[in-house]
Amino acid sequence: MEILPAIDLKNGFAVRLKKGEMNSAKIYSDKPWELAEKFADLGAKWLHIVDLDGAFAGEAKNAKTIEKIVKSTNLKIEVGGGIRDEERIKFYKNSGVSRFILGSAALKNPEFVKQMAKKYKIAVGIDAKNGFVATEGWAEVSNIKACELAKIYADAGVEAIICTDISKDGMLSGVNVKFSEEIAKSSGIKTIASGGVKDLSDIKALKQSGKIYGVIVGKAYYEGSIDLKEAFLIAK
């Protein structure tokens, strides 16, 4: 099972939010590229980056910072937040990004996502509030169930689905294993769990499930409630 440490960017700083609320941002670093180096030293293979400003604005706002992070590390990097067209994917690809996360586009423009999946390594980001898909930086909640959206991409050639339970995100309240399993079952696609990881017990629960490909760890690391080195050992 892969563990993907997370860097969420707001105005060039590494921050964490609670339940996706921008006014809850807590700054953890003004040099996010140094965090990337630290994660590599701890044993990470992947890094999960979200341009929070981009997610709300629908365009890349932290592109220069992301470029600097990519140049500072040999980690494979996936990026999401504000990717709505192929030009942005090309820009990030040329910067050295490995995988591109399409969230709002996955709900609003599935044909675009399917086309991009034929050309690039695409992860579909499915973020849910009470089981329903939320978009535009989680500011809008649709009437589409997360599992129904996952099914749409079953044979589309996307590389992974990243599923987030928004009610858990940034709360250190424990990961929603059942939700992640349902997404994996609905889609048959490698599923990465996100939101709520609090300690090593969450890593163990996801690993024991046997159905989850990966997990994103953010606030638990920044707040010191998880030993990442130990987490990588458990996930192996």
Curated annotation (Swiss-Prot):
CDD domains reported for this sequence: HisA (cd04732)
Location(s) in or outside the cell: Cytoplasm
Q: Does the keyword Kinase apply?
A: no
The family database entries (NCBIfam families) matched by this protein are listed as: 1-(5-phosphoribosyl)-5-[(5-phosphoribosylamino)methylideneamino]imidazole-4-carboxamide isomerase
Protein name per the record: 1-(5-phosphoribosyl)-5-[(5-phosphoribosylamino)methylideneamino] imidazole-4-carboxamide isomerase
> Looking at its record, which EC class is this enzyme?
isomerase
**GO MF, one example:** 1-(5-phosphoribosyl)-5-[(5-phosphoribosylamino)methylideneamino]imidazole-4-carboxamide isomerase activity
User: According to its UniProt record, where is this protein mainly located?
Assistant: cytoplasm
> Which Pfam families does the record match to this protein?
His_biosynth
Supply the InterPro entries for this chain.
Aldolase_TIM (IPR013785), His_biosynth (IPR006062), HisA_bact_arch (IPR006063), Isoase_HisA-like (IPR044524), Isoase_HisA-like_bact (IPR023016), RibuloseP-bd_barrel (IPR011060)
Q: Which residues form the active site?
A: D8, D127
This protein's encoding gene: hisA
